[in-house]
Design a protein with these regions (language model features):
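C-terminal helical cap(s) of enzyme catalytic domains, especially alpha/beta-barrels
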Residues: 142-146, 150-159, 233-242, 337-358
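Active-site pocket-lining/capping segments in soluble small-molecule metabolic enzymes
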Residues: 10-26, 31, 262-311
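Catalytic domains of carbohydrate-active enzymes, especially glycoside hydrolases
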Residues: 48-68, 214-224, 322-328
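Acidic (Asp/Glu)-rich catalytic clusters
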Residues: 55-59, 81-88, 110, 114-121, ...
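N-terminal beta1-alpha1-beta2 module of alpha/beta enzyme domains
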Residues: 1-87, 199-200
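Internal, glycine-rich beta/alpha segment that forms the wall or movable "lid"
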Residues: 12, 16-19, 33-41, 105-218, ...
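Hydrophobic faces of well-ordered beta-strands that scaffold small-molecule active sites
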Residues: 4-8, 64-67, 90-96, 121-125, ...
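Alpha-helix-loop-beta-strand connector modules within alpha/beta enzyme cores
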Residues: 76-94, 346-360
Length: 366
């Protein structure tokens, strides 16, 4: 079965490219209603609209959602906790960086969230952050040391975690010891209600050699993005290095999408957004960034955090998603999120994964 995750918004949502024009989630300027049915202020809070996105994800049948780390957006841990409380089935991945806190503290928070959610919390560790963001947080770890710290972080977090239940024992731990360059733990380990829980599934990202090495050792899932040089070489290297350690790592591909009933309708949406983002027309024609197989390299000019994604009819986008080799699933996103989630759930996911998402497919594999 193909896994599908959806990346949640972190700074509000809406149909426009300019964030100040998007009023969902309380980030843009308030806009007067054209039809006044209820003028009472405060009837809909800023988090209610994000809650609707999360609810749409559950209804649409995606397997999980991701609360991204965003220094200027909503706190990902709070969003993830709210999503776990609101849902019953979807997995929820919280993205955070190792400087967020000690690995023991992150593990303890996660243990409580696993109790709350019947084990649906996952982690996406963001090892590399923008240098300006790191300085603003007082984080002085740079370069390859970031991966060394992440290695220690995940080692300690797993070390204090006990998958089997351990009876309470006063204030003592379970004897876990660790002495590293970034963390030191003496008599660590969880007991009582913090034990006997599944450790969060660990997602890691990046195409660099350091990223692949870290994922081969610690990752359960690795998320790639499409680049001009592709992801296939890194994916094969990851599989080989994980196998050397007796492990396997699932591979996901992160992609923004614009999918509609017809290809022309999808491109009409792109061109409306392009004209808004480039009203002077000096940036050229949006179709000049079209690539083969429904790929388009202009998503970063429309406010997304990566350039390459997919545009086309539902059939075209599904065909391209199905063609990616060495990939076990996808992290999709699109704006506005509520509408795009419902489109994906109703028209796209079953085309990519008929065996897992249609009755006929499930009966054929029974």
């Amino acid at each position: 079965m193909t896994d599908f995750y959806w990346e949640l918004p972190s700074r509000g949502d809406g149909r426009r490219v300019a964030s100040e024009l998007n009023t969902r989630g309380g980030f843009g300027a308030d806009r007067p209603a054209t039809v006044a049915t209820d003028l009472r202020p405060g009837k809909l809070g800023p988090f209610d609209e994000l809650a609707q996105v999360i609810h749409a994800a559950e209804l649409s049948g995606v397997d999980g959602v991701i609360a991204p780390y965003d220094p200027s957006g909503e706190e990902s841990w709070v969003v993830a906790a709210a999503a776990l409380r609101q849902t019953r089935h979807v997995r929820v991945a919280v993205e955070f960086h190792p400087a967020f806190g000690t690995p023991v503290y992150a593990a303890k928070m996660s243990a409580t969230l696993q109790r709350l959610s019947s084990g649906r919390l996952e982690w996406r560790l963001k090892v590399e952050t923008d240098p300006a963001d790191a300085r603003a947080r007082g984080d002085q770890v740079t370069g390859r040391d970031r991966y060394a710290r992440a290695d220690e972080f995940l080692t300690v977090a797993r070390g204090v975690w006990n998958d089997s239940e351990v009876l309470p024992g006063g204030f003592g731990g379970t004897g876990y010891e660790f002495a590293g360059n970034h963390y030191d733990v003496i008599d660590g380990g969880f007991r009582g209600i913090l034990s006997g829980l599944p450790f969060p599934v660990v997602h890691l990202t990046g195409n660099s050699d350091e990223a692949v090495t870290l994922s081969a050792k610690h990752g359960d899932v690795h998320q790639f993005v499409l680049t001009d040089t592709g992801y296939e070489t890194s994916a094969r290297t990851l599989a080989d290095r994980a196998l050397e350690q007796g492990r396997s790592v699932r591979k996901l591909l992160r992609l923004p999408i614009i999918a509609r009933e017809t290809t022309d309708e999808a491109w009409a949406r792109v061109e409306r957004l392009w004209r808004e983002a480039h009203p002077d027309g000096v940036s050229g024609d949006s179709r000049a960034l079209a690539r083969e197989n429904s790929q388009w390299s202009g998503f970063d000019r429309l406010g997304y955090d990566q350039p390459i994604g997919l545009i086309g009819s539902y059939e075209d986008v599904a065909r391209e998603l199905s063609s990616f080799r060495h990939i076990d699933g996808f992290v999709l996103t699109g704006r506005p999120h509520i509408e795009e989630l419902h489109r994906a759930g109703e028209h796209l996911l079953h085309l990519v994964d008929p065996a897992g998402r249609t009755l006929a497919g499930q009966e054929a594999h029974a």
